[in-house]
Every structure is written in structure tokens, then in C-alpha cells.
Amino acid sequence: MNDSKNRYFVKNTANGSFADIATLFDGVAVLMMTGLSSKGKPVNIYSEQWVNEQEEDFLITTLDENNNPVVIRENVDIELTFIVRKKYATNQENFDVLAKHDAFVDYMTNTDVWLKSAYMGNKYVHCVCEKEYKPTAIMLNRGDNSYMTGTITLHTLDATKVEAVTPQSKQET
């Protein structure tokens, strides 16, 4: 049984619909996704402390349409840790751990993707893999006990967004 079903979602087009990773890639279980709620270091705040003062002067260089300061942050990385194993597949007939692993990694690393976690409500993020990927464990040729694990690091391309919930999309997730 795959306990990660209906918890982690992905799509590879802006207008597409989010699909459950465990359903889209039968046999893949997401173990952990970190960084979705992280905030990067501010890049548009400047401060200076003067020799004869305890207080610092500061400037936030970006303003919104009402002249209110807006902090701009560096984009962060998301880490997606997963396992591919026959026992997590709904259809176990002719299940190939290596082929399923390669298909999943190709999908996640060959183009930009959008990720969403049920643990974070309707928050989602647009990201792309900019780093190399290496499996963390390769245990093949062990019959039904064969598996592969890995962690894919994806760089966010913009700030985390919140998906508008419609009655139809609420039923799907």
C-alpha cells in the first residue's frame, strides 16, 4: 500500500491540472517534500549602523503601487525524497523498478514543474531542477524487495502561490 497517495501533486504545464504523483507514477511513494514553506533571504533591504548610534538606518528599495515597502526574497530550493518499489504499485504485474524510477526522474528533471502538497493546503510552487540528480540507494535484482530511493532538488522560479479552490478541484484533491 502506498501511504503517500493524494498527498503530493505535480503538473508540467501552467494551465494543466495537478495529478497525484503516486497515481501518475504507480509504484512511486513520496517520502518527504521540504522547502515548500521556506522563505529566501531578503535581497532588497539595506542597513547601516553608524559609529555613534545604536540604531541602524535601513532602506527597502521596492515599493508597491501604494508606496508601501515590499521585501523581495531569493528563491529557495525544494527537496523531494521518494522511493520506487513494487509493493507500492497498484499494478504489480511486470513492474520494473528501474524503468519506473527513470520515468519519474525524467518527468521531474527534464522540464519545469509545479508542485503541491496536501499538507500545505492550496499552496503550490513553480520550479525546475538545476542540480545533478543521483539515486541515494539502488537495490535491484532482489525480486519483490527491489527498490530505488532518491532526492530531487528543485529550484523555485517564483514565490509560493495559493491555488483558487473551485468545487470541482476541491473534490479532485
Range-by-range predicted roles:
Residues 1-173:
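Extracellular/virion structural assembly segments
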